[in-house]
Swiss-Prot record:
InterPro entries: Ribosomal_uL6-like, Ribosomal_uL6-like_a/b-dom_sf, Ribosomal_uL6_a/b-dom, Ribosomal_uL6_bac-type, Ribosomal_uL6_CS. Residues 157-177 are annotated as: Disordered. This is Large ribosomal subunit protein uL6. Keywords: Ribonucleoprotein, Ribosomal protein, RNA-binding, rRNA-binding. It comes from the Bacteria. It comes from Caulobacter vibrioides (strain NA1000 / CB15N) (Caulobacter crescentus). The keyword Protease does not apply. GO terms for molecular function: rRNA binding; structural constituent of ribosome. Part of the 50S ribosomal subunit. Gene3D superfamilies: Ribosomal protein L6, alpha-beta domain.
Amino acid sequence: MSRIGKKAVAIPSGVQVTLAGQTVTVKGPKGQLSWTIADEVEVKQEGAELLLAPRVDTKRAKGMWGLSRTLVANMVHGVTVGFEESLELVGVGYRAAMKGTALSLQLGFSHDVDVAAPAGVTFAVPKQTEIKIAGIDKQAVGEIAAKIRRIRPPEPYKGKGVRYAGEKVRRKEGKKK
């Protein structure tokens, strides 16, 4: 029995959920998201709640049950509140700037690195060493944040690089003479 899957997904006021076969569409004040649920999982709407249940009793169906419930809950949260990820640039001369809707990063390379914002994701640069990524799709926000971090991940000796806000970088001791 999935402890996550058996919880109902609450639908707040102002959010409209449409079920068309296995496709769930969620409309809210921030936008619209759509996702096709695996065939092993059944979706029912009862009042202001969405209930999910496995159609068959297999290991895959149970796994997809919890996953589907979490993804639908993330869709509802995304269209009401949205998701945000913060990145910090640590290092001498490391800075970020907006270039239209794209992000221009100076990360110690001989050239600037430009990152285009995918659909539904926006960048903000409150300080030169801070990047805020916002959007309604949790996967898209997390994926672009990971992509930016991968350009120059924090190194263990000095801690320089792009890191998530609040991330603790495990430091190593340098070689001894």
